């Protein structure tokens, strides 16, 4: 992550150490290990190991395909998870708020409220246009998304 973006993240998020799986912690180059405590299957089925949590190979292939750097990619298990993770990363519970313009995808509100983040709903004006004045009036230093 580039330092110029750090100011947008919650302090507690920046202080976290990246997750390391048991496979990374106990890596042994000399022999293949089966980590039964990680619920790995020692038998040769097609799904006998957990995938790489950092998705290094997948990001590398997508980056090559799209002609971008792999650190420009963020992958999630669908839009619900992505929205939740964005709110967790940027919004301080009980302090910050997000703004939504109904009708919109319901998970913005559900995720924000689940994590203790206030939701300000800004109604549309005629012909489903944004009310930019209302958005600007509702926005302040605690507006995050």
List the predicted regions and their residue ranges:
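N-terminal "arm"/small-domain region of PLP-dependent enzymes with the aminotransferase-like
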Residues: 1-64, 145
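A general structural motif
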Residues: 31-33, 70, 94-95, 142-143
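Short glycine-rich anion-binding loops that position phosphate/pyrophosphate groups of nucleotides
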Residues: 39-42, 79, 105
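Phosphate-binding glycine-rich loop
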Residues: 59-97, 115
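Conserved PLP-anchoring active-site segment centered on the Schiff-base-forming lysine
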Residues: 89-111, 125
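Short beta-strand->loop structural element characteristic of the AMP-binding/adenylate-forming
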Residues: 118-124
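Active-site phosphate-binding strand-loop segment of PLP-dependent enzymes
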Residues: 126-145
């Amino acid at each position: 992550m580039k330092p110029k973006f750090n100011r947008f993240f919650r302090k507690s998020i920046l202080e976290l150490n990246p997750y390391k799986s048991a496979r990374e912690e106990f890596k042994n180059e000399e022999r293949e290990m089966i980590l039964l405590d990680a619920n790995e299957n020692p038998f040769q089925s097609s799904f006998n190991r957990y995938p790489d949590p950092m998705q290094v190979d997948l990001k590398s292939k997508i980056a090559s395909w799209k002609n971008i750097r792999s650190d420009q990619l963020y992958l999630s298990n669908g839009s619900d998870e992505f929205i939740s993770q964005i709110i967790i990363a940027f919004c301080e519970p009980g302090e910050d708020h997000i703004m939504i313009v109904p009708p919109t995808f319901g998970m913005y509100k559900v995720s924000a409220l689940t994590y203790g983040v206030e939701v300000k709903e800004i109604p549309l004006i005629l012909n489903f246009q944004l009310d930019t004045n209302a958005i600007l009036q509702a926005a302040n230093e605690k507006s995050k998304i």
